[in-house]
Amino acid sequence: AYEMLRSLVGSEMCIREELEEADEDLSVSLFGTLIDSLTAAGYEHYEISNFCLPGFHSRHNSSYWTEKKYLGCGPSAHSYNGTSRQWNVASLNEYIRGISNGNPTFEVEELDLYTRYNDFVITHIRTQWGMPLPKLRKQYGEELYKYCLRMATPHLQQGTLEIKNDTLKLTRKGVFISDGIMSDMLWVE
């Protein structure tokens, strides 16, 4: 499910062959055991890599998964207003200088319809709530709605996706290959 970043201590140990990276089958088995153990203990598996006791979902991450607008303050902080993403300069000194001069340094990415659709797919399909198909159709139009269903069809047939109550969701089997499923469903020109 995850790859080690070169900057992590464990990855350096793998490079020096002091620590072996678990093979994929073992990783899948361990993640399955984690899901089973935590859900048996009363935790909700509400997002691919998030578990919580009922009612204790991450408020911060839930903003991403529910398309809520958010404001990020400070160096490297990100904001989202529904049509664009914005992020502040990473350097603390540069950030303070910009604020002091009344001219904060940040970058903006305007999000076109297809980018917003891709964000919708990535953020919704990862959660236990899935992707509400009527909302997809209303927000992104008939073309992207049909595209999404066409791209989802092989996964529906393989049992890695399901549609329940007009909502497209990963099955347990799909959770283990979610990156591939999401990438199949993204709009690529």
Where are these regions (language model features)?
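Short, amphipathic alpha-helical interaction segments positioned at domain boundaries
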Residues: 173-189
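Single conserved hydrophobic/aromatic residue that forms the stacking wall/gate
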Residues: 1-15
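A short, conserved structural fragment
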Residues: 156-166
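Short amphipathic alpha-helical interaction segments
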Residues: 142-156
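C-terminal scaffold of the Radical SAM
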Residues: 11-142
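Minor-groove-contacting beta-hairpin "wing" of winged helix-turn-helix DNA-binding domains
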Residues: 167-171
